[in-house]
Structure formats: C-alpha cells, structure tokens
Amino acid sequence: MAAQRFAEQLGEQIANEFAASQQYIANAVYYDGLTLPRLAAFFYQQAVEERNHAMMMVQYLLDADAEPVIPGVAAPQTSFSDIAAPVELALTQERRVSDQIAALMGVAREENDYLSEQFVQWFLKEQVEEVASMSSLLAVVRRLQATPDFVEDYLAREDRAASADPTAPPAAGGAL
C-alpha cells in the first residue's frame, strides 16, 4: 500500500506526464507543419513516452491498491516563434519534471514508503537521460537554426529509436 501522501502526489504527477505528452504532440504538429519530419517524429515519440510514463504511474497506483485519478490537462502551447522554441520549451519542461520526480522521491522517503521510493528511482534515471537528450538537441537546433535540414540530418544520424527498457515499470494497458 502506497502512503496516502505519496499516492496523492503521484496522482498530480500523472497529470504532469499527460500534459507533457500533449505538449510534445503540439511540438510535433508544429514541425510537421514546417515539413521537418524527423523533428516531428522525435516529438511524436516523446509524446508516446510521456503518455507511457503516466500509465506506469497509473499501474503502480492500481498495484498499490490506491485509486488513480485520470486528470484533464490544460491546452498545450501550439505556436512558436522559431524552430528552437519548441525544443527550449521541452527542455524547460524536462527540467521541471526532474524536480517533480525528485520531490516524489522526497515524499516517499519522508513517509518511509520504501516500495514507492524504489518505484520512483527508475524515473529519476529516466530524467537524467531526458534532460541530456533535450539539451543536446537544443544545442544542435540553435547552431543550425538557419539550416533546419541539417537538424533533420543530425536526427537521422543519431536515430534515437526507442528500445524497450527491461527495468521500466509496467504501464497500465501494456505498452500500447
């Protein structure tokens, strides 16, 4: 059984993950509209990843006999000043999520909820990767902003295709 306070905070994080997923869809659609398919694909994949993070949290609450609440989310930002702006927004979002996940870890520790603390550890590791990936992409986009096709080439070379992480928590509904 998850500590009540942890379950409540995790419920808030579910909302944050769904909001991140929606924002990444908006980023992808922006890039699709500019005919930048690799940037679009990158963010469509990020959207799926964030949605799956939310579903992992839902599954944890189900497994911990806590009632998950599926929240509504605010509309994402859909217009941007230039091709770097969506990546800048994504990096800011990933840094904020890192702080939120760290706070979840703090709540689990304060509540002596060792099972929840163990669950959150995977997300901490994931956030290090997310911030690093978005930081690198932002550096490339800023450097190549005048030649977005070179950003597309960079993404093609990097080919960060998602591979299944055997240490990832299970997601509610499976990895849909």
Residue ranges and their predicted role:
Residues M1-L176:
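Iron-associated oxidoreductase/ferritin-like identity signal
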